[in-house]
Swiss-Prot record:
InterPro entries: GHMP_kinase_C_dom (IPR013750), GHMP_kinase_C_sf (IPR036554), GHMP_kinase_N_dom (IPR006204), IspE (IPR004424), Ribosomal_Su5_D2-typ_SF (IPR020568), Ribsml_uS5_D2-typ_fold_subgr (IPR014721). ATP binds at residues 93-103. PANTHER family: 4-DIPHOSPHOCYTIDYL-2-C-METHYL-D-ERYTHRITOL KINASE, CHLOROPLASTIC (PTHR43527:SF2). It comes from Staphylococcus aureus (strain bovine RF122 / ET3-1). This is Putative 4-diphosphocytidyl-2-C-methyl-D-erythritol kinase. The active site is at residues 9, 135.
Length: 282
């Protein structure tokens, strides 16, 4: 048996630069991890089946599950003769902008690499993972990073300053492809990637909070105004900075002090079913 942890990610910044010839957007984003985790265990099987065990109403256990697809890809790539049972204990909210599915897929690639003693490098696993998901290369490493291209080009950055994170997911799901289709690249939106990069370089917490920016946020807010209300609620309750992560709908707030973080947590706990008080990892 092999055990892997799959932490959630949040975006400090997210920008889309142009539409690529392959139909995807060229993206530029700075991401880090928080200590909200899915936990996965892996067992070899005597047959060649891939079995995903998960108790969650909204997460499939078939080929639509990214962990299943990662296992399928891994077994094909390394021509394995055995299948695997993957058990997922899910804590990361689903369709939330926190890369829960990608984190599980990345953990699956790392886990099978160990389970079958393949000895592939993390770089090799990241390249493999990029075939099925843009956030998977980042999730292979679980380090604070600037990600460009489709997300597969990674530059590691300093860990962020120590802080509390209040994560709140409104009671709705958002499809990332649907949000990306609505991007208007002619419309100006300032994303502070350089400011965030420098803030991490200098471990400047205040500058980090000022740099939080996401081009997808106004698009998701136009469809779901409660995202903006939630963000404003966090800021009014004392968050040093707040932002929607990914394509949403999860909003997070940053706080330096635990008492401050608990105030924000209590302020938003009544309006969302899924609220978490966690720490930055990076």
């Amino acid at each position: 048996m092999i055990y892997e942890t799959a932490p959630a990610k949040i975006n400090f910044t997210l920008d889309t630069l142009f539409k690529r010839n392959d139909g995807y957007h060229e993206i530029e984003m700075i991401m880090t991890t928080v200590d909200l985790n899915d936990r996965l265990t892996f067992h070899k099987r005597k047959d060649r089946k891939i079995v995903v065990e998960i108790e969650h109403n909204y997460v499939p256990s078939n080929h639509k599950n990214l962990a299943y697809r990662a296992a399928q890809l891994f077994i094909e790539q390394y021509q394995l003769k055995q299948g695997v049972t993957i058990s997922i204990d899910k804590e990361i909210p689903v369709s939330a902008g926190l890369a829960g599915g990608s984190a599980d897929a990345a953990a699956t690639l790392r886990g099978l690499n160990r389970l079958f003693d393949i000895g592939a490098s993390l770089e090799e696993l990241a390249q493999l993972g990029s075939k099925i998901g843009t956030d998977i290369p980042f999730c292979i490493y679980n380090k604070t990073a600037l990600c460009t291209g489709r997300g597969e080009k990674i530059e590691f950055l300093n860990k962020p300053p120590s802080a509390w994170v209040i994560l709140a997911k409104p009671n709705l799901g958002i499809s990332s492809p649907d949000i990306f289709k609505l991007i208007n690249l002619d419309k100006r939106y300032d994303v502070h990637t350089k400011m965030c990069y420098e803030a991490l370089e200098n471990r400047d917490y205040q500058q980090l909070c000022q740099s939080l920016s996401n081009r997808l946020e106004p698009i998701s807010v136009s469809k779901h105004p409660q995202i903006d209300k939630l963000k404003n609620n966090m800021l009014k309750s004392g968050a040093d900075g707040a932002l929607m992560s990914g394509s949403g709908p999860t909003v997070y707030g940053l706080a330096r002090k635990e008492s401050q973080a608990k105030n924000i947590y209590n302020a938003v706990n009544g309006c969302c079913n899924e609220v978490y008080l966690v720490r930055l990892l990076g």
